[in-house]
Swiss-Prot record:
Summary of the function given for this chain in its UniProt record: Core component of nucleosome. Nucleosomes wrap and compact DNA into chromatin, limiting DNA accessibility to the cellular machineries which require DNA as a template. Histones thereby play a central role in transcription regulation, DNA repair, DNA replication and chromosomal stability. DNA accessibility is regulated via a complex set of post-translational modifications of histones, also called histone code, and nucleosome remodeling.
Classification via CDD domains: HFD_H2B
Residues that bear N6-acetyllysine: K5, K42
Compositional bias annotation for Low complexity: 1-10
Organism: Tetrahymena thermophila (strain SB210)
Keywords: Acetylation, Chromosome, DNA-binding, Isopeptide bond, Methylation, Nucleosome core, Nucleus, Ubl conjugation
Protein name (database record): Histone H2B.2
Length: 122
């Protein structure tokens, strides 16, 4: 048997990588309404729980509702040739999007929340 040859010397040198200054991509946190949905659920039905799938559905529903209200409000502002979105446009959008008693209840709760916020910030 012939003796094994040593591998040929390579002329390539190992290239050291320069230290990178790039930051690792942080995971983007998605904000949900889950804690608020849970608080309302416990106010209405203290002994009832909610599954993760149902919570995701409720979160999507709230996001969709807010998006529709914002879109309708912005259309009303543009239609009236104004530059400022006020509570009046939001109330009108709610009246257009929600049926009857639900719209009246939503408007009264919204007005109550705005009044509470205004009085606390003064």
């Amino acid at each position: 048997m012939a003796p094994k040859k040593a591998p040929a010397a390579t002329t390539e040198k190992k290239v050291k990588k320069a230290p990178t200054t790039e930051k690792k991509n942080k995971k983007k946190r998605s904000e949900t309404f889950a804690i608020y949905i849970f608080k309302v659920l416990k106010q209405v039905h203290p002994d009832v729980g909610i599954s993760k799938k149902a919570m995701n559905i409720m979160n999507s529903f709230i996001n969709d509702s807010f998006e529709r209200i914002a879109l309708e409000s912005s259309k009303l502002v543009r239609f009236n040739k104004r530059r400022t979105l006020s509570s009046r446009e939001v109330q009108t959008a709610v009246k257009l999007l929600l049926p009857g008693e639900l719209a009246r209840h939503a408007i009264s709760e919204g007005t109550k929340a705005v009044t509470k916020f205004s009085s606390s910030s003064n």
